[in-house]
From Swiss-Prot:
PANTHER family: DIMETHYLADENOSINE TRANSFERASE, DIMETHYLADENOSINE TRANSFERASE-RELATED. Keywords: Cytoplasm, Methyltransferase, RNA-binding, rRNA processing, S-adenosyl-L-methionine, Transferase. Pfam families: RrnaAD. It is found in: Cytoplasm. It is an enzyme of class 2 (transferase). Specifically dimethylates two adjacent adenosines (A1518 and A1519) in the loop of a conserved hairpin near the 3'-end of 16S rRNA in the 30S particle. May play a critical role in biogenesis of 30S subunits. This is Ribosomal RNA small subunit methyltransferase A. It catalyses: adenosine(1518)/adenosine(1519) in 16S rRNA + 4 S-adenosyl-L-methionine = N(6)-dimethyladenosine(1518)/N(6)-dimethyladenosine(1519) in 16S rRNA + 4 S-adenosyl-L-homocysteine + 4 H(+). Belongs to the class I-like SAM-binding methyltransferase superfamily. rRNA adenine N(6)-methyltransferase family. RsmA subfamily. SMART domains: rADc (SM00650). InterPro entries: KsgA/Erm, rRNA_Ade_diMease-like_C, rRNA_Ade_Mease_Trfase_CS, rRNA_Ade_methylase_Trfase_N, rRNA_adenine_dimethylase, SAM-dependent_MTases_sf. GO terms for molecular function: 16S rRNA (adenine(1518)-N(6)/adenine(1519)-N(6))-dimethyltransferase activity; RNA binding. GO terms for cellular component: cytosol.
């Protein structure tokens, strides 16, 4: 599948990409091959693709693995892929990924085969990419994700403590997985061209055994980063008793002047547990 194929398909079928779904189709053969290459796929890996679109990456993935599962919301693209890729190792469902239990879906196709690793390989729809990332990192089965997202989001996910991009989302993701930005992708490699640059990142799931409510932790982190210029204890005092906060800082030997951007992810988890015990 090349640029001409996709552009001709768009013309022939009067296909108007959905802004609501964040549809920007990858045209570059070089980039799609590069994404698959960095995923280092073994035949015994189960691959999950989210938002396969016209199948630019799908047609390569299906040659690399014994089990490829794709989730596509757009009924037009779902119908296209049902006829375009007919190999027995390809399975596609027409659904919103945010409504799918990923682990249950994987188990449905993993009851007879010997699986080495479970990997997500995808060009994510940018409008909901943060929500998809949160689903991926909470999976008990997914080992790795090689995903394309907005460059800005990639930088937030991979941000280090004491840097500008470090925020609540950074901390939440890094509590669940190791992160690495692999390479950037220019907007001209898509149709229609997005207004932002993109990047491919690797998430290695830590399969965190720590028992906590991710929604409650997310709320806590947003409070911590509510005003990045304020001291952390001042942000926390909007919700928690200042006396308890001060004692917590003493117990953990923390500087009272620290801001949220100065705190490592694992320490945030300790603070969360301390204040919510």
């Amino acid at each position: 599948m090349n640029k001409s194929f996709i552009k001709n398909k768009l013309k022939q079928e009067s296909f108007v990409p959905s802004k609501k779904m964040g549809q920007n189709f990858l045209l570059s053969n070089n980039i799609k091959n590069k994404i698959v290459d960095v995923a280092n796929i073994n035949k015994d890996d189960l691959i999950l693709e989210i938002g396969p679109g016209w199948g630019a990456i799908t047609e390569i993935l299906v040659q690399k693995t014994n089990i490829l599962i794709a989730i596509e919301l757009d009924k037009r693209l779902y119908a296209h892929l049902k006829t375009y890729i007919k190999t027995s190792n390809f399975h596609i469902i027409n659904n919103d990924v945010l409504c799918v239990d990923l682990d249950n879906l994987i188990l449905d196709y993993n009851n007879t085969q010997k699986i080495q690793k479970i990997k997500v390989v995808a060009n994510l729809p940018y409008a909901i990419s943060s929500k998809i990332v949160l689903k991926i990192i909470q999976s008990k089965l997914i080992n790795d994700a090689y995903i394309m997202v907005q460059k800005e989001m990639a930088e937030r996910i991979g941000a280090k403590v004491n840097t500008r991009g470090y925020n609540a989302f950074t901390v939440l993701v890094q509590l669940f997985c190791k992160t690495k930005i692999l390479f950037e992708v220019n907007a001209k490699e898509f149709h229609p061209q997005p207004k932002v640059q993109s990047a491919v990142i690797h998430l290695e799931n830590l399969h965190n055994s720590v028992n906590f409510n991710i929604e409650e932790l997310g709320k806590f982190l947003r409070i911590c980063f509510l005003n990045k210029r304020k001291k952390l204890k001042n942000n926390l005092s909007n919700i928690y008793d200042i006396k308890i906060i001060n004692q917590m800082f003493i117990d953990y030997n923390l500087d009272m002047n620290l801001r949220a951007e100065n705190i490592e992810p694992k320490m945030f988890l300790k603070l969360f547990n301390y204040l919510n015990r």
